[in-house]
Amino acid sequence: EIESSYALDRLVWQRSNISSTAKTLAYSDIIGFSTYVWNKNYNYTLAKEIKTLNPNATLVFGGPEIAIENKDIFQKYPFMDIVIKSEGEITFKNVLLALKNNKSLEDVPGLLINRKGQLVDTGRAVRINELDCIPSPYLSGVFDDLMKDTQGVEWNATLETNRGCPYGCTFCD
């Protein structure tokens, strides 16, 4: 159902000129940002530029660098529409299905939603216990065209043996 309703048009995996990248992405309906310490500032600048060009684009952020405990997150980052609080694979799929079927995002667990600067927290998503249920982007062909178009680039696969912080501190977990 996702594949027939949405197209994965572009993977931005290298830092390119912000303005040209924003112009390329701006007229997408939904844009996802996987945010880490090494791309956080680039992603935020790119997202601001995209929102300037297309205020109707839905910008979805996730990743370990998003400060989900910050209750003022949408005042600080008003360009964010949706933040996925934990593992994104199933939650992002549920976001896409809700948007496609005109269902309320408030029924999708695991989100922070920006409602005109006010935070709506949809609770916790169910944790993925069996990582084998998630298709590998390498084995499913998601990266095939990208790798073919970038001959000479050394690619590395990531082997995930666990996820998240192992400590389970009460302030975070």
What is the meaning of each model-derived region?
Residues I2-E130:
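Glycine-rich beta-alpha loop elements in corrinoid/cobalamin-binding modules
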Residues D132-D173:
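Radical SAM [4Fe-4S] cluster-binding motif and immediate context
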